[in-house]
Amino acid sequence: VWFAAGQSNMELQIVAGSPRSRDGNGLLLTSMARLPYVRFAKNRKTWSVAPTNAAYAGWQRFEPASFAIVKSPASALSALAFYYARELYLALDIPIGIVDSSWGGTNIDAWTPREGYDLHPELAPGKYPVTANWNPSLAKGAISGGCQQPTVIYNAQLAPVAPFAVRGAIWYQGEHNTNHEDEVPTYAARMHALHDGWKKTFENPDFKLYFVQIAQYWCGDDEKRLDRWFDVQRQQEKFAEEEPNAGMAVTSDVRSWKDVHPRSKLAVARRLLLLALKRDYGFSDVVCDSPVFEKATRLDNGDVKLEFRHAPKGWYVYNDDFSQELSFELRDADGVWHPAQVRNLHKPTYVWDGASGVGRDAHLVIGWAPGAHVFAPKG
């Protein structure tokens, strides 16, 4: 059993809603969804300033009749949750359960239990509408924030089923936090608080959290917001590096540049699936991690050698415009950037020419242009 939680990209529905707010293939695939050993539950949107015991969801079957009912919980099921459960079942041939607890526009704090903040007290001061002993209170401001108040969605949607036995959660959230400049530098710490809190309340020290890199999005002329967007992505990477029971599905190539809600969730679900198959279900040959830049080494001839983790057999570039060039530039001592000449395409290491007179102490940037993607041979 897995939870599916997060904001609007997790909530994007498999069938219900307008064409813009549902998955592009959902109507077709749900009409063929006859999976007798898969069950799902769709949580109702509700919040509470104190933990509750009332659960507003029940198990339903993965079958066409369920999804065909207009405005039913099935028709509003998260597309990502649908695909993740379906792909797990097809890969494992065992019973699978998925609980959808998504809510668009919500921040990470609302999903975090108080136990998470007990373990990360640096995040708590002056933030939460409760007393020092965490007794429920209606202090000034406690209601005005609605579902954005810290802990309130956890209290109403997850607390009623903890410590229900679950393997872990898939998580797609972070876009909301880019709106708050003061929260961006601590987003990795907030993910730790969320994960540590869930591990404790579900009494599962190996609770897995497989999450999606926030969608690539064109922020118009708002350069500050674009910077915050990329900073949250870096915070997500930081958390994934620090937490062995977490993994990030990179999706920079799976997006609609001017729509923060990409409609095709199948590719995203399959990348989350690879993490679970590799780390939880014994598929040792599966490649689940994307290439990560590790180091650059200046060679005696002036070239610079690049090395990437998770790409032992090499890596390649494939861009939105179908080109296979990655943007490299070198900065000289005067701060002037120079295009770099690429060599040795598709080798385990990537080398480009550093003979343009920039000097041995040059700075470098890699893949800075939008739409440039690095892949390992298997993805």
Regions found by a protein language model. Give the residues of each.
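Cell-envelope and extracellular/periplasmic
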Residues: 1-379
